[in-house]
Amino acid sequence: MAAAAVSSNPRTVEEIFKDYSARRAALLRALTKDVDDFYSQCDPEKENLCLYGHPNESWEVNLPAEEVPPELPEPALGINFARDGMQRKDWLSLVAVHSDCWLLSVSFYFGARLNRNERKRLFSLINDLPTLFDVVTGRKAMKDNKPSSDSGSKSRNGTKRSIDGQTKSSTPKLMEESYEEEEEEDEHGDTLCGSCGGHYTNEEFWICCDVCERWYHGKCVKITPAKAESIKQYKCPPCCAKKGRQ
């Protein structure tokens, strides 16, 4: 059937990424510019429907492939059934998540014969683009400035004390409009203050304990950005108390 037809057989990293980008553009249009048309086509009264993105940048709502196993990995089945049981934005977000998964599965199906470095390069190219979920939900993704576990102590400490987004060279950049400049908050969004339990926000100064690696609001532990610069190794109040008991 048309939905399962493959118009190309990409083999190199560049060809596979081009295929990914075209399919992604198609799905993105269905979920944004053509969203009213897409929404109306996903009638819950119809049979199991899938959203397909094709290499020619066209999208299609259709029944799944009849052959088993299908020629390509299939997108999520029955996206139409949940349409009227959810808020529109939540349903579109759900479709976007499943569509992101499908795009990856198709790309790595084509990339089955790639070697390790080629797969890594392919994923890097894909990862540089915002996901459909990012775009549909308006979620801002920000750069990963969280230090790796094997980074040097100076760099690690400097970064940990610089989450206030000020002008030090090791600090994260302030939020900007482009996707490439907006990935830090996504990384730290689930971080909770070890004192008050509040969520991380980019507007406040945070500091990380070098012993237990918990994060704290500077105001909760009475540490200012200026004071943090003079501390070689920061220990949070619980760690200081623990050492005192020992």
Swiss-Prot record:
One of its GO terms (molecular function) is histone binding. It holds the Pfam family PHD. The lineage of its organism: Eukaryota, Viridiplantae, Streptophyta, Embryophyta, Tracheophyta. Belongs to the Alfin family. The record marks Y200, W206, D210, W215 as: Histone H3K4me3 binding. It comes from the Eukaryota. It comes from Arabidopsis thaliana. The modification N-acetylalanine is found at A2. Keywords: Acetylation, Chromatin regulator, Metal-binding, Nucleus, Transcription, Transcription regulation, Zinc, Zinc-finger. The PHD-type zinc finger mediates the binding to H3K4me3. This is PHD finger protein ALFIN-LIKE 2. Residues 177-188 have a biased composition (Acidic residues). GO terms for biological process: chromatin organization; regulation of DNA-templated transcription. Ubiquitously expressed. Histone-binding component that specifically recognizes H3 tails trimethylated on 'Lys-4' (H3K4me3), which mark transcription start sites of virtually all active genes. PANTHER family: CPG BINDING PROTEIN (PTHR12321), PHD FINGER PROTEIN ALFIN-LIKE 2 (PTHR12321:SF122).
